[in-house]
Swiss-Prot record:
The keyword Chloroplast applies. It comes from the Eukaryota. Pfam families: DYW_deaminase, E_motif, Eplus_motif, PPR, PPR_2. PPR repeats lie at residues 82-112, 113-148, 150-184, 185-215, 216-246, 250-280, 288-318, 319-353, 356-390, 392-422. It is found in: Plastid, Chloroplast; Mitochondrion. The keyword Mitochondrion applies. Its main location: plastid. This is Pentatricopeptide repeat-containing protein At1g59720, chloroplastic/mitochondrial. It comes from Arabidopsis thaliana (Mouse-ear cress).
Amino acid sequence: MVVRSIIVSPPTTITYYHPMSIGLLVHPLSPHIPPASSPSASTAGNHHQRIFSLAETCSDMSQLKQLHAFTLRTTYPEEPATLFLYGKILQLSSSFSDVNYAFRVFDSIENHSSFMWNTLIRACAHDVSRKEEAFMLYRKMLERGESSPDKHTFPFVLKACAYIFGFSEGKQVHCQIVKHGFGGDVYVNNGLIHLYGSCGCLDLARKVFDEMPERSLVSWNSMIDALVRFGEYDSALQLFREMQRSFEPDGYTMQSVLSACAGLGSLSLGTWAHAFLLRKCDVDVAMDVLVKNSLIEMYCKCGSLRMAEQVFQGMQKRDLASWNAMILGFATHGRAEEAMNFFDRMVDKRENVRPNSVTFVGLLIACNHRGFVNKGRQYFDMMVRDYCIEPALEHYGCIVDLIARAGYITEAIDMVMSMPMKPDAVIWRSLLDACCKKGASVELSEEIARNIIGTKEDNESSNGNCSGAYVLLSRVYASASRWNDVGIVRKLMSEHGIRKEPGCSSIEINGISHEFFAGDTSHPQTKQIYQQLKVIDDRLRSIGYLPDRSQAPLVDATNDGSKEYSLRLHSERLAIAFGLINLPPQTPIRIFKNLRVCNDCHEVTKLISKVFNTEIIVRDRVRFHHFKDGSCSCLDYW
């Protein structure tokens, strides 16, 4: 064995200097890094071990840089033990979030081990601004061929691909995984499930999941999360039931399960999930802040603000997301005063929680649903003035909708034109909707519609169905009795293969969800439902109800009877009729609808709540409506 003595004092006796050490030696060596006592104090191996031990004590970048300088001055770079030390320095600089320094260290090394590549790829994968660099590093690793990727390489490359929605890049990595023989590795497969799930390729994610020779809890969580993220709520809950045969759920599992219940709008399922959490989960899981926040969101979205507030009040520890969940919950239920009161509590000296952009979205929604224009303007200004939060597109969308729906359409248009970013289809449609509700001139409505109809943005923001603006414009024409123009809109939609998104409403009875589409005749109780609709119509007409035919603009304009019949068969009316047949008298009827409630159905539901003496809760695309005794919680402002 060749032993090299290390002489570190005086500095002039050191025989090797690395170029990167220039600029590092301006820092005096830390007391944590004393020089070797004499040339014969240790062997080279002991010296490397000594430096490695010192590396374990580094607590910040200042100490690490001094250690790096010491390593450069007292070791030979070609020694395997030195390369191992460089890998440790890479790892520490990454853990101290100094990725730029990690790159400098990496670039100063001639031959890189798999560990070095993996360390830098991992650092980039964890840094939001450098996700793409992680994939580029992986490609460079393959091109150089210094070392092969291993099972530690792929999970972080896949994580980076998932973040940038790099489906094609991810497929390439998948091929490399198979080529290098890691197709059966549980950690690699977890990364593939996360990748495909993030890109919306649920079939591929499920294929990887089903073919795994072994699964971890992360495997189940990743698959359940992917299903929930893309609206496959029933499948997610079914997979959760299967998971319980092999694993105990953790906090991540329960967050996904509660999100699935919220997505279904099922209060009974949400209550079951809450009971499961308390009965079968570890105490730490049940008390976890993130899980509690998911509980609050679930109860808010399932229509029970009382339970949401009960969970909130029972929390021993709250974070900003806890407050935001309650503010958004009150906002979507039209309880603006409570939302604003919660905000005041949140920012007072006792709680001293600093709001973020999500907080102000909730406040603006609250003001929007109650028509509090001045308060909305105050919060919009406060966000910038007091908290230095730059308004995003979502904030502008809220304030524009608030101002326009209050009747200040010209002011809303001026704000849209002065926005620092391009308005999206949602903003233009909110202006068009305000024109429809406020009886603005047809000419102004047409001018607004030209900014959106037929554009790519309208198509994308309508979930692939670009009917939104067409339907709104047709309602403007219908309200003005311009039926020829309504016909032109219908013809344009037909020529472009555009159809109105079908309304769909669901109601849950005895744990079973029943789904209805507009004009549906597929339910086993269709005959009784249609008979009940006739009873409802007769009783409402007896107290003066007249259908608002302008709410069915796309139905044959020459046949008023067809329009009235079409309105009677809207999906929420079928669901309400079904509820009246199958629920005990005076039991609240809970409806979950995919579209915004139309004016006529809103009026009808108010009357049903009075005539049949029942509470009806409708969650539509925008908000909750609580109908009782002939009135609605929205105060007819939605």
